[in-house]
C-alpha cells in the first residue's frame, strides 16, 4: 500500500503533488487528449503534431487545452512525465536512465533538471524518501 507522504520540513509539498485535479473539466476532446498523452509518455511528442492528430489548429488546441486544464499542453505533458517518474523512482531496482527513457526523455541530466524544477528535489533525493531506513547503531 502507498502511504501519504508529508514532509514537514518543506514549505511546499509540490514534490508529492498530483496532476489528477486537472482532469475535471467539460471539454471531452481535451479529456481524450489527456488520455492519449498518458498512454504515450515514452514517445517524442510535439505539440503541433498533437494538435493535428486531434484535428485542431495549434492555436485552438493550446487555447482549449489551457482553458480546460489551466496549463499549457507542454507544461501538462512535462508534469505528467514527472508524475510517472515519481512512481518509477519508488522502485529501487529501476535505474534513472531507464526511468528517463520510460517517460520520454533521452538526456538524463535534462530530465533531472526538469524534475528538480517541478518538485524542488533531485530524482535521487525523491527516491531516498521511499528507501527503507537502516537503523543506526
Where are these regions (language model features)?
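Non-catalytic terminal regions of proteins
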Residues: 81, 112-113, 122-127
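Terminal helix-turn-helix DNA-binding modules in bacterial transcription factors
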Residues: 43-49, 56, 66-108, 128-137
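N-terminal positioning helix adjacent to the helix-turn-helix/winged-helix DNA-binding module
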Residues: 22-33, 69, 78-81
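An amphipathic alpha-helical interaction segment
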Residues: 1-21, 32
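Key DNA-contact positions within bacterial/archaeal DNA-binding proteins
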Residues: 59, 109, 124
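Basic, amphipathic alpha-helical hairpins
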Residues: 11-14, 29-46, 65-69, 86-95, ...
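Short hydrophobic/aromatic patches on the structural cores and recognition surfaces of FHA
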Residues: 61, 85, 111
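Short amphipathic alpha-helical surface patches that mediate protein-protein
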Residues: 2-6, 116, 131
